[in-house]
UniProtKB/Swiss-Prot annotation:
Family that this chain belongs to: Belongs to the stealth family.
Lineage: Bacteria, Pseudomonadati, Pseudomonadota, Betaproteobacteria, Neisseriales
Protein name: Capsular polysaccharide phosphotransferase
BP GO terms, sorted: polysaccharide biosynthetic process
Known EC number: 2.7.-.-
Keyword NAD: no
Annotated keywords: Exopolysaccharide synthesis, Transferase
UniProt function note: Part of a capsule gene locus. Expression was not detected under standard growth conditions.
Coiled coil: none
Domain of life of the native organism: Bacteria
Family matches, as PANTHER family: N-ACETYLGLUCOSAMINE-1-PHOSPHOTRANSFERASE SUBUNITS ALPHA_BETA (PTHR24045:SF0), PTHR24045
């Protein structure tokens, strides 16, 4: 080792040890087995490969669907607490009534902005709501955006509902919905320009964003959420029709490419089981996770989906770790090394950073270059 290198080592020893540790113990930001150091290389490689077939067949329309609630709406609050009062708490799933599940930090505004900015090829953006309208939405300006009320999709005898599983089970009934669509929760944000073939191949094959997790390990950790049990129940139904399958894996917490005809097939196969939970006003442990488990895996088993890479940063808005992730995402944006997406989840109000909402807004305004008054 020459003298200059020795001097550099002592002058920048922190960089040396950082790089050493990163090589020895590479950091992981995502739910797939992809170390941070390889994220950008893999995103570029995938995009270059996909571009080779993007014009083989004519493009087909692709819509985006959001589900959203405004928990600050007084009428919604009154209806929610009136509906919740007679329900036996023992029947309700973990976090199902936690205020964080319905908290509104204007996520929808930022998520829609991201779709419009980074996915301009989307045909329609449907927002499914409980007869609510975002304050920022001017439909004369946002002509692609269409509001859909629960009453347009769900039988009146099941309304009102505050159960995302019930709402998701009926998404395929959206009027004028395209065969190929992408389902978003409003806590998922597109982080970079994405082409249609990130979601659907040119021949219509959907992307299946499989997570590097297992139901068994999730249960061992002890957090038995309604999403976990609803996915396990859905898996039992899939095994009834595909008895040789061995699925033990959820999907990445991000957007989900879906097909309307696969929804229709699921209803034809499992109508009784779906109808059995539609009257649950909030999430219980006896339901089906259709939009982010049953339908995507049904598509895969029928040959309509294939596993794909999805680099999505996933963290909780209320945790102290969120600020670290905000800084990392802004740094990566500055250097054009952004992930595909990020999900800033808000499922539990426990142990919250007291300034979490302010940190979130400041980050989002900066990342998406939103001018504030």
């Amino acid at each position: 080792m020459n003298l200059n290198k020795i001097r550099k080592f002592f002058r920048e020893s922190h960089i040396f040890f950082r790089d050493f540790l990163n090589k020895r113990f590479p950091p992981y930001n995502v739910e797939q087995p992809i170390p941070e150091t390889e994220e950008f290389t893999l995103i570029n490689a995938d995009a270059n490969l996909a571009s080779l077939t993007e014009n083989v067949l004519p493009n087909f329309p692709i819509d985006v669907v959001f589900t959203w609630v405004d928990n600050t709406d007084k009428a919604w609050q009154e209806q929610y607490y009136r509906t919740l009062q007679p329900i036996d708490q023992e029947d309700i799933g973990l976090y199902a009534t936690d205020p964080a599940r319905f908290s509104n930090h204007n996520e929808l505004f930022y998520s829609v902005q991201a779709v419009q900015k980074f996915m301009p090829w989307v045909r329609n953006i449907f927002i499914v709501t409980a007869d609510q309208k975002p304050k920022w939405l001017d439909e004369n300006i946002h002509s692609k955006i269409k509001l859909i009320n629960h009453s347009q999709l769900i039988d009146a005898k099941y309304l009102p509902t505050f159960n995302s599983h019930v709402i998701e089970a009926n998404l395929y009934k959206i009027p004028d919905l395209s065969e190929h669509f992408i389902y978003f929760n409003d806590d998922v944000f597109v982080a970079r320009p994405l082409m249609p073939n990130h979601f659907f191949e040119n021949n219509g094959l959907a992307s299946l964003f499989v997570a590097n997790k297992s139901f068994q390990k999730m249960r061992q950790r002890g957090l038995i959420t309604p999403t976990l049990t609803a996915s396990e129940h859905a898996l039992k139904l899939l095994k009834r029709h595909y008895p040789t399958i061995n699925i033990n894996t959820p999907l990445v917490h991000t957007y989900v490419p879906l097909r309307k005809t696969s929804f229709q097939k699921a209803w034809s196969l499992f109508e009784d089981e779906i109808n059995s939970f539609l009257n649950n006003k909030v999430r219980h442990n006896s339901e089906l996770n259709m939009a982010s488990f049953l339908i995507p895996w049904l598509m895969y088993l029928d040959g309509y989906a294939t596993p794909k890479r999805e680099i999505c940063y996933y963290f909780n808005i209320r945790s102290s770790h969120a600020q670290t992730q905000y800084k990392k995402l802004l740094f990566e944006k500055e250097h054009l090394h952004m992930p595909h997406s990020f999900c800033i989840n808000d499922s539990s109000s426990n142990n919250a950073d007291k300034n979490y909402a302010l940190h979130f807004r400041n980050f989002m305004d900066t990342y998406f270059e939103i001018e504030t008054e």
